[in-house]
């Protein structure tokens, strides 16, 4: 779940998720900090070469994430010249933006998308976005099968509706 956003991940391609909660907690990004302080998580995904996405592409991806249940989808673009561009930069320092870049393993020319919310929702949204990007960027070799044997799965899962483990 933490790496792929799903308990049935497609492991034929990368684009693993990463945690930037500790970095965001040190920032001025109050909305996300409040989410983290109330038991939420923040996970990101690095899209190689994504700095080339148009504003319309980013808006469409944001709408897709919202259709999956996200309240918002934040992004940081790391331009080819090494500069970062994002509305998020009003709330994070240049050092924090660089720390996020390093955590993601991002390079100049990449874009990072991230979501903060309750863990189950974040994993669902990011897992679905991961599959979307895998298909959109043609990263999935459909002729290849990559079986995965899950051995450490949770026996019970918390249900918000029931208010108990099920």
Language-model segments: which ranges?
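Class II aminoacyl-tRNA synthetase catalytic cores and aaRS-like
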Residues: 1-166
